[in-house]
């Protein structure tokens, strides 16, 4: 499994990339492999408030539907509209073109509650 060292992670298999005051969020390689072929993504609307560990998006595969959780409190500033027409980007490029949404975070200190790459690797074995 690919677990980039420069990202943060949640126990619910989201990855987080810090981009100034914003963060970009997607699901991990482990999560997309468990879901198998992604066929639909329900994206959050720009401007939607997000609460930590509360579902904000849904990824559906041929196998299951899975909630995607906001890793920290913030406001949605961008959603990856490319997933509407090509949800398989989550499978083919989960850490790049397969990102799901971006948040403007309310408090950068909240990021301290997220996992390092090593902690996430330990979690998934």
Task: Give each language-model segment a name.
Residues 1-58, 88, 92-125:
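Acidic, low-complexity mobile loops and tails
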Residues 22, 73-75:
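Structural motif
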Residues 29, 63, 72:
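A short beta-strand motif that forms part of the nucleic acid-binding face
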Residues 42, 65-68:
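Composition-driven detection of intrinsically disordered, low-complexity segments
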Residues 61-64, 81:
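Short, conserved catalytic or interaction motifs in soluble domains
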Residues 67-71, 104:
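Histidine- and aromatic-rich ligand-binding microenvironments
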Residues 76-92:
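Short, charge-rich, low-complexity interaction segments located
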